[in-house]
């Protein structure tokens, strides 16, 4: 494919021009990203505010309010009906913005906190109709991995705001809706979902992160017994990743940045908790 591409382009420009286009000069030190000085704080804030304006439904947009949308301004409406795990990653971006401005812009801080609360009240756009799977918090879902991402988002909201409600919801959702599912599998690993009990790395990676985070909170609160329980849960989930890991470190038959990344972070967290350098 590379040979064909080169041949095709060479008809439109010289070989040297093609080389210049495909192999730009590498700049070391203060990397030059633009022909002008970039204010990175301003750039980050600009991207964040544009993202929130376009993808967070601060008002009713085609029937959705207080949640994030697939499309800008929720132009497609009904397509947002099963938009759940994506909410967690969008929320992570909003939390990062909030962390940057909360000490310097009281008005903006209050606005974003209001968005957090709206999102929480809407249970992060959880579309799950089975009340048993939703659990008492309303954040549980058929998909275990989706629920884990929402739990992680709630932890991030708690860390940023100190609002105990977010922590309590995350912990209860894990204890009630996620961890009990390990009893449904012979291996003791978490299943992909209630309706498909096969464990996989896209579930057990973020699950290990969630459990390790709970262990951190428990240890910080002086509850070492609870910390050890959550460490054991994190290690159990991590074992699933180890089980499918090839000798070169790739996970599963199709390595993904998603699963490789969650495995790496889970291992780092467990190492910090246990001191076991094997992780």
Locations of the language-model features?
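Well-ordered alpha-helical scaffold segments within catalytic/enzyme domains
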Residues: 29-37, 88-106, 149-163, 206-224, ...
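Low-complexity, Ser/Thr/Pro/Gly-enriched N-terminal "stalk/linker" regions
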Residues: 15-138, 160, 164-188
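Aromatic- and glycine-enriched pocket-lining scaffold segments that form the walls
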Residues: 164-236
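Bacterial N-terminal signal peptides
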Residues: 1-8
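Amphipathic alpha-helical segments of tetratricopeptide repeats
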Residues: 121, 178-179, 216, 239-243, ...
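Extracellular glycoside hydrolase catalytic/binding regions
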Residues: 230-232, 242-250, 254-259, 268-279
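Carbohydrate-binding/catalytic loop surfaces
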Residues: 63-82, 128-157, 186-208, 247-268
């Amino acid at each position: 494919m590379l040979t064909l591409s080169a041949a095709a382009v060479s008809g439109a420009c010289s070989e040297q021009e093609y080389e210049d286009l495909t192999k730009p000069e590498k700049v070391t030190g203060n990397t030059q990203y633009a022909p002008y000085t970039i204010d990175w704080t301003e750039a980050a804030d600009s991207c964040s505010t544009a993202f929130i304006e376009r993808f967070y439904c601060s008002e009713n947009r085609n029937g959705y309010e207080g949640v994030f949308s697939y499309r800008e301004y929720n132009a497609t409406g009904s397509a947002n009906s099963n938009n759940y795990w994506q909410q967690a990653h969008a929320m992570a971006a909003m939390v990062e913005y909030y962390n940057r401005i909360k000490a310097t812009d009281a008005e903006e801080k209050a606005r974003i906190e209001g968005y957090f609360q709206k999102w929480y009240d809407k249970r992060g756009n959880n579309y799950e109709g089975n009340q048993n799977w939703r659990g008492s918090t309303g954040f549980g879902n058929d998909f275990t991995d989706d629920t884990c991402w929402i739990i992680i988002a709630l932890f991030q909201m708690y860390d940023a705001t100190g609002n105990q409600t977010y922590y309590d919801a995350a912990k209860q959702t894990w204890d009630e809706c996620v961890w009990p599912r390990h009893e449904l599998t012979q291996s003791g690993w978490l299943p992909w979902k209630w309706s498909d009990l096969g464990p996989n790395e896209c579930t057990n990676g973020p699950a290990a992160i969630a459990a390790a985070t709970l262990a951190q909170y428990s240890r910080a609160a002086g509850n070492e017994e609870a910390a050890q329980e959550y460490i054991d849960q994190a290690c159990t989930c991590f074992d699933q990743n180890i089980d499918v890991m090839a000798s070169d470190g790739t996970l599963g038959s199709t390595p993904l940045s998603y699963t490789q990344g969650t495995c790496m972070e889970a291992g780092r967290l467990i190492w910090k908790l246990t001191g076991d350098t094997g992780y």
